[in-house]
Structure formats: structure tokens, C-alpha cells
């Protein structure tokens, strides 16, 4: 299994973001509270 990506790291499959980060259209993990 892959480690969860931190802020501004990739979330290209099969990588996933650490909560509460979300994957944006550029496939980067971002904090939704800060906007996209």
C-alpha cells in the first residue's frame, strides 16, 4: 500500500491524500479550506 500524500504532493493513482486534503484537477493534494 502507498503512504498517504501530504499537502502539495501528488495524488495520481494509486496515491491518495491525507485527510482533510483533497485532490485537485492538477492531481495535487490541497487543503480545501485554503481553496484550490
UniProtKB/Swiss-Prot annotation:
- Where do transmembrane segments lie in this chain? none
Q: GO cellular-component terms in the record?
A: extracellular region
> Where this protein primarily resides, as one coarse class?
secreted
Q: In which tissues is it expressed?
A: Expressed by the venom gland.
Q: Where in the cell is it found?
A: Secreted
Q: Which domain of life is it from?
A: Eukaryota
Q: Which UniProt keywords apply?
A: Calcium channel impairing toxin, Disulfide bond, Ion channel impairing toxin, Ryanodine-sensitive calcium-release channel impairing toxin, Secreted, Toxin
What GO annotations for molecular function exist for this entry?
calcium channel regulator activity; toxin activity
Q: Which cysteines are joined by disulfide bonds?
A: 11-23, 17-29
The record's misc note reads: This toxin may reach its physiological target by traversing membranes, which may be by slow permeation. Alternatively, scorpion venoms are known to contain amphipathic helical peptides that form pores in the cell membrane, and it is possible that these pores would allow this toxin to enter the cell.
What task does this protein carry out?
Affects the activity of both ryanodine-sensitive calcium-release channels RyR1 and RyR2 with high potency. At lower concentrations the toxin increases full openings of the RyRs, and at higher concentrations it inhibits full openings and induce openings to subconductance levels and reduces the number of full conductance openings. The different actions may be attributed to the toxins binding at different sites on the RyRs, with binding at a high-affinity site mediating the increase in full openings and the induction of subconductance states evoked upon binding to a lower-affinity site.
- Mind telling me what this protein is named? Insecticidal toxin LaIT1
Organism (species): Liocheles australasiae
Name the lineage: Eukaryota, Metazoa, Ecdysozoa, Arthropoda, Chelicerata
